[in-house]
């Protein structure tokens, strides 16, 4: 029987070697491709909070795999329960982590909990890969021939077990010959667009141009953006979406310029217990991310040492600004959302 120790995950950003979890350091990309050991709860939490491992689906998968590996290593049920609690608190906004850990907790309660946790973790990886493919197929059907699309942050294989969410849509649209090019927001303050999405699109052979976040409005006014595609970290019961900071700005601009604004996400990003965007916890991050820059390219500070900084990692886009929620189950329309599609009874 195949165990986690012998498994080839076939993901871009996670691997298991000799029963230990390794992550691709996404803070070092694109200058360096470095793998970091994440074999303890403390080390994985540190990597998550430092954004060395990031992306709502991938965070949940990394936590699930580590728990299963720790179970195989002989960690007691009581200690695994403590690990679950600690991992759950590592990043508050992305709901995939909470959903995955809830499933791992159910596996932990089984009589054969070691085997059950390994099976559940592998199931989560396989499911995420399949969900990405379904999202890509549904989304690509919305892309018209010759489209110039704009995307924000990073939503590809680096952030998932599969081809990604919004980037998966771009990939399939490109393969179908309908994509002219992608405008890539650099995504301040941590430059996930400039560092990760630009690198990923280049690896996939998808034509793109990198822009500063503040250039998006000008491009829309010139008619050079046909649609905007973003991912999501949490979808509330009323359809509001939490995503990387700057997403809301794009949605407002798209609404003004009458450009379709699509959210691509798996159903695991939906939180039926969260009534609306106001109830979504928004992570606040360090001032140093705004006063300067660091990563694989070195460190530079441009703001005064004592500059006051406001640095939320996410913002909330109201459902009224979204043209469609592209899930693994299909494209959800504003009319369906208004009728209660995301409400708990569903």
From Swiss-Prot:
Pathway: Amino-acid biosynthesis; L-methionine biosynthesis via salvage pathway; L-methionine from S-methyl-5-thio-alpha-D-ribose 1-phosphate: step 1/6
A matching Pfam family: IF-2B
Catalytic residues of the enzyme: 233
GO BP: L-methionine salvage from methylthioadenosine
One Gene Ontology molecular-function label: S-methyl-5-thioribose-1-phosphate isomerase activity
Signal peptide: none
Keywords, in A-Z order: Amino-acid biosynthesis, Isomerase, Methionine biosynthesis
Catalytic activity: 5-(methylsulfanyl)-alpha-D-ribose 1-phosphate = 5-(methylsulfanyl)-D-ribulose 1-phosphate
UniProt: substrate binding residues: 54-56, 91, 192, 243-244
Record-linked NCBIfam families: eIF-2B_rel, PRK05720.1, salvage_mtnA
Function summary: Catalyzes the interconversion of methylthioribose-1-phosphate (MTR-1-P) into methylthioribulose-1-phosphate (MTRu-1-P).
Homology family: Belongs to the eIF-2B alpha/beta/delta subunits family. MtnA subfamily.
The name this protein goes by in its record: Methylthioribose-1-phosphate isomerase
